Amino acid sequence: MGGNAVIGCHCHTCKSNIRLLDSTNSVKGLLETALEMNYKGLAITDHEVLSAHLEAIQTVRSMKKEGEMPQDFKLILGNEAYLVDSLEEVRDNYQPGKTKFPHFLMLAVDEKGHEQLRILSSKAWENSFYTGTMERVPTVKKDVEDLLKKDPGHIIATTACLGSEVNIYLQKIMEVEKNDGDPELIKEYKLKIHQFITWCIDVFGKDKFFIELQPALSEEQIYCNKKLVQIADGYGLKRIVTTDAHYLRPEDRAIHQAFLNAKDGEREVDSFYEACFVQNVDEIHERMNYIDKEIVEEAIQNTLLIGEMIEDYTIEHEPIIPKMELPNFKLRHLFKPAYDKYEYIRKMSESKDDQDRYLLKLIEDGFENKLLKNDLTRDEFHKILSRINVELGELWEISQKLNQSMASYYVTVREIINIIWDDECGGDSLVGAARGSAAGFLINYLLDNTQINPMQYDLPHWRHIHKSRPDCQS
């Protein structure tokens, strides 16, 4: 790798729009444009959301298979988090216009690193709260520190954009300098920057923490870039350059602006996102001509270095069916006289998996409470058992394919629904409506997952799930 090549280490897709309109890039469009700009790799770093990663993996694999992408193209999976000192500072002492949620970029080196990203992202969403209509999802430094110090070396971090902690304080210094302000205030801001940089070095290590420059033309970005060059030299850190792509190319800027203003017409977006597109090496050099060309070139080459540090891995895996801890139970074998006639009822009763047997126990209870009546005829009894047998057959065959018990899914859903209804959870919670196909499954009715007997309405079970196309909705 080298020459006129670069890796885009900071790029956004439309998945960044989960909380705030942000990017017009599709995963496929972003990758195609990166190739057109001679990129040797690309990082997906959406704003506190990892949901584009699987699509990116599958798209890259498909493009390589079809010969649309070089085999050595490097996909990097990352996250742009909102890194804060403490939850109390930003949530409990929030001040409109003053409280900051600094941006921070993290890239997974390997599968373990991606697991760490997922843990931190989940924690950020657990921390979520609203300021007006804006949902905040802060990542607390202590959580990053505690997690990564247990198993370091799996995540690369960068200082991110103008919205990052280091750049927020650099811009404060710029304002003080403009106004011939208090040198003690500048000293205070410099100390904040020092504390942030040393924290990053301590948590991520010098070799996995990079100073990020960006080729925007704003006064603030130019000032910060010049200072960031000095900071990198002062702490012995490597620099990279990123374009923080939120749209594909300059001709898409107007569309991106209209998209962002569609929800908030007063939001100023034009100058802020002026440079946030997929830029080639020549465009980067042209925009950063106020910095020595060798420094910019080295920063570009360091993006390729990051690519070399990233391992090839996938986050794909076979479906994992949720499984809850079961209470003590005893199967009554209510249907034992019919075991010979109904293969899958018998198989569930004899299963070595306690989830299978527990599901049958719940079916027994539901049958007794809901369907067993004094005037139940023999034909009606066998129609019910035949339906139960067919539905259990679907679950059994899928379980064999997955080597996991499908029964545990229904048992777990039942428990979740019971928790929602439980007075101990507040007593005022509602179970939301689903797509509807779950109502066609008699077992759901017997477990109280649904409240409609599908046999009364001739609802087919296969609309809900079939061994040829598993699909659970409840």
Regions found by a protein language model. Name each.
Residues G2-A5, V166-Y169, I173-G181, I186, ...:
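Non-catalytic structural connector segments
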Residues G2-G41, H47-A216, Y223-Y235, H256, ...:
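Extended substrate/RNA-proximal surfaces in nucleic-acid metabolism proteins
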Residues G29, E48-S51, E55, K112, ...:
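Generic recognition of stable, solvent-exposed alpha-helical segments in well-folded globular domains
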Residues E36, S62, I419-C425, L442-Q451:
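Alpha-helix C-terminal capping segments
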Residues I44-L50, L213-E220, Y247, S405, ...:
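Conserved short loop/turn motifs at secondary-structure junctions
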Residues K74-N79, D85-L87, K100-H103, I240, ...:
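Phosphate/diphosphate-binding loops
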Residues G113, I240-R249, D428-Q451:
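Conserved phosphate/anionic-ligand binding catalytic regions in large, soluble enzymes, centered on
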Residues A245-R253, L304-I306, E316-H333, S437-L446, ...:
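A glycine-rich phosphate-binding loop feature that marks nucleotide/adenosyl-phosphate handling sites
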